[in-house]
Each structure stands twice: as structure tokens, then as C-alpha cells.
């Protein structure tokens, strides 16, 4: 039995193309893997704080007494990391906003990037500690950006996730959704076909 974690980061709720693709994937995965468990975490529904001068020290404990905010942040970071460690398949929705990922997803990444916990420094360089997991990234874009210079999202996600040990990454694209109904429908259909194959 596998455990699947779905991380939603779109601010568009039911109007989100990536949320629709995530829900489609969940449906197909449950059909084909009835014994597997699926956990859904909506990063827009829970407030994940942006790091500031106070909170960054919560993730780098020095032995000093922590403030209430720092304690809450460290507890949240521990919870999010434990959730990642406990799951085998990680599905991340990552719509392109202004050529990059949503703020909510960036704040999540800041919570889980912790030296000695999700990565460590060795004499041979940094080593990611979240190994042996499958990552599926669902990304939607209003225009066509795949493999072009405007696609900053894919290389960033590959770099960050590989840094913490998540190297088995597959991207599923829903592109051109702002180019008219026909283009949007075709993009969704193409993404569904890919997701159906992954979930089989």
C-alpha cells in the first residue's frame, strides 16, 4: 500500500485548472489503487507564514528561548516535514503566477528546507534526505511557456526538490488556458490523458 500526499497551492479554488487536474488524478488513483491512502493539504486554506527575521531563527535552533511565534512555526515545520517523510507519492499543484510559483508554495518550501532534517552538508556538497519518493507536479499556464526562456518554474522546482532529495519528478502541463475555450479544453484533455496513464 502506498501513501499519496496532494499539495494544492492555487488561489483560484474551484476555478483552478491545477486543482481540477489534481481532483482528476485523485479520482483515477483511487480507482486503480483502492488500498492506498490519499492526504490532501490545501496550502491556501492554512496560513503558512512567510519567513522573517524572527521566524527564520525558529528553523535554526540556537538553544535560546523561543517566542510563541517561533514555537508555532517550528511545530508547523515539523508537521509538514513529517507528512512528507510519511508519504510515498507527492503531487504538487504549481500554477504559473507572474512566471513563478504561488507565494503559498514558496512559503511551504521555506518551511520544509531545514539543514540536518531534509538536507545536510557533506564534504562532497549538499545531500538531500527525502529520498525514494515519486513527485508529480501539475502546472498550468495562461500562455505557452514549456521549454522556453520564460519557463522559470520548471528549473526552479527541479533544483529545489532535488536539493532535498526528491529527484524522481514528472511534470504534467496544462498550457494555453487563457488562449480561448478550445485551447483550454485541449490542454485539459491532454493533461488528463497523461494523468490517467500515471495513475494506472
UniProtKB/Swiss-Prot annotation:
Cofactor: FMN
InterPro entries registered for this protein in UniProt: Flavodoxin_fold, Flavoprotein-like_sf, FMN-dep_NADH:Q_OxRdtase_AzoR1, NADH:quinone_OxRdtase_FMN_depd
Record field: catalytic activity: 2 a quinone + NADH + H(+) = 2 a 1,4-benzosemiquinone + NAD(+); N,N-dimethyl-1,4-phenylenediamine + anthranilate + 2 NAD(+) = 2-(4-dimethylaminophenyl)diazenylbenzoate + 2 NADH + 2 H(+)
Co-factor binding comment: Binds 1 FMN per subunit.
Organism superkingdom: Bacteria
Keywords: Flavoprotein, FMN, NAD, Oxidoreductase
Binding site for FMN: 10, 96-99, 140-143
Enzyme Commission number, as recorded: 1.6.5.-, 1.7.1.17
HAMAP family with a match to the protein in the record: Azoreductase_type1 (MF_01216)
Name of the protein described by the UniProt record: FMN-dependent NADH:quinone oxidoreductase
Gene that encodes the chain: azoR
Amino acid at each position: 500500500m502506498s501513501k499519496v500526499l496532494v499539495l494544492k497551492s492555487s488561489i483560484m479554488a474551484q476555478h483552478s485548472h491545477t486543482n481540477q487536474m489534481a481532483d482528476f488524478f485523485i479520482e483515477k488513483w483511487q480507482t486503480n489503487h483502492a488500498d492506498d491512502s490519499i492526504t490532501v493539504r490545501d496550502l491556501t486554506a492554512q496560513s503558512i507564514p512567510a519567513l522573517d527575521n524572527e521566524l527564520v531563527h525558529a528553523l535554526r535552533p540556537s538553544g535560546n528561548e523561543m517566542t510563541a511565534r517561533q514555537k508555532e512555526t517550528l511545530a508547523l515545520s515539523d508537521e509538514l516535514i513529517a507528512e512528507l517523510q510519511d508519504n510515498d507519492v507527492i503531487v504538487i499543484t504549481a500554477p504559473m503566477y507572474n512566471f513563478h510559483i504561488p507565494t503559498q508554495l514558496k512559503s511551504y518550501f521555506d518551511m520544509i528546507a531545514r539543514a540536518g532534517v531534509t538536507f545536510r552538508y557533506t564534504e562532497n556538497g549538499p545531500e538531500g534526505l527525502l529520498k525514494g519518493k515519486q513527485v508529480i507536479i501539475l502546472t498550468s499556464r495562461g500562455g505557452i511557456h514549456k521549454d522556453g526562456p520564460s519557463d522559470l518554474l520548471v528549473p526552479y522546482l527541479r533544483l529545489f526538490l532535488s536539493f532535498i532529495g526528491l529527484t524522481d519528478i514528472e511534470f504534467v502541463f496544462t498550457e494555453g488556458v487563457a488562449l480561448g475555450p478550445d485551447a483550454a479544453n485541449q490542454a485539459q484533455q491532454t493533461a488528463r490523458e497523461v494523468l490517467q496513464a500515471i495513475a494506472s
